[in-house]
């Protein structure tokens, strides 16, 4: 097979249906909209209106709410931190906090804090100032000789 022999699969490309172009076309006159009624008229359709049938947003019960006080944390794995250290983006002399992670390009946007997760391995001794760290992440950091601090202001 050569590049000039390539073609689309049968039925992959279909001609668009041109409606309202004469009765011989099969979709002339009413153009597939039926006869009369709100949905046959021109203009925008009503969002959520199902032709008089009880709409889905009223058939289903209300559920849950948006917690205004919920904290949105940046989740960072130890593997990503180790790769940033290996490439020289992260300085291990200073404690790692949310600003250091932002400058290293590990997180894009500063949120309410940092959540350390244990995915990957940490090979160097390093100190962290973070909002939260999983138990497994804490154990891996302490095994490598590092420390985890949870400042009140973070």
From Swiss-Prot:
Q: How does it assemble?
A: Part of the 50S ribosomal subunit.
Q: What is this protein called?
A: Large ribosomal subunit protein uL15
Q: Which NCBIfam families match?
A: rplO_bact
UniProt lists compositionally biased (Gly residues) regions at 21-35
Is rRNA-binding there in the keyword field?
Answer: yes
Name any one GO molecular function.
Answer: rRNA binding
Family under the similarity heading: Belongs to the universal ribosomal protein uL15 family.
Example GO biological process: translation
Residues covered by region (Disordered)? 17-44
- Report the GO terms under cellular component: cytosolic large ribosomal subunit
Q: What does this protein do?
A: Binds to the 23S rRNA.
Pfam families recorded? Ribosomal_L27A
Q: List the disulfide bonds.
A: none
Which gene underlies this protein? rplO
PANTHER family from the entry? 50S RIBOSOMAL PROTEIN L15, LARGE RIBOSOMAL SUBUNIT PROTEIN UL15M
Q: Does the keyword rRNA-binding apply?
A: yes
Q: Which InterPro entries match?
A: Ribosomal_uL15 (IPR030878), Ribosomal_uL15/eL18 (IPR021131), Ribosomal_uL15/eL18_sf (IPR036227), Ribosomal_uL15_bac-type (IPR005749), Ribosomal_uL15_CS (IPR001196)
Q: Keyword annotations for this protein?
A: Ribonucleoprotein, Ribosomal protein, RNA-binding, rRNA-binding
């Amino acid at each position: 097979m050569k590049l000039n022999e390539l073609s689309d699969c049968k039925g992959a490309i279909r001609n668009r249906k041109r409606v309202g172009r004469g009765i011989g076309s099969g979709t002339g006159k009413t153009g597939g909209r039926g006869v009369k009624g709100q949905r046959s008229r021109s203009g925008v359709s009503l969002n959520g209106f199902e032709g008089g049938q009880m709409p889905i947003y009223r058939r289903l019960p209300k559920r849950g709410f948006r917690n205004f006080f919920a904290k949105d944390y940046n989740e960072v794995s130890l593997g990503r931190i180790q790769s940033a250290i290996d490439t020289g983006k992260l300085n291990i002399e200073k404690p790692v906090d949310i600003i250091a992670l932002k400058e290293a390009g590990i997180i894009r946007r500063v949120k309410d804090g940092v959540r350390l997760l244990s995915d990957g391995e940490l090979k160097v001794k390093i100190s962290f100032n973070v909002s939260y760290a999983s138990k497994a992440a804490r154990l891996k950091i302490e095994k490598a000789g590092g420390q985890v601090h949870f400042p009140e202001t973070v």
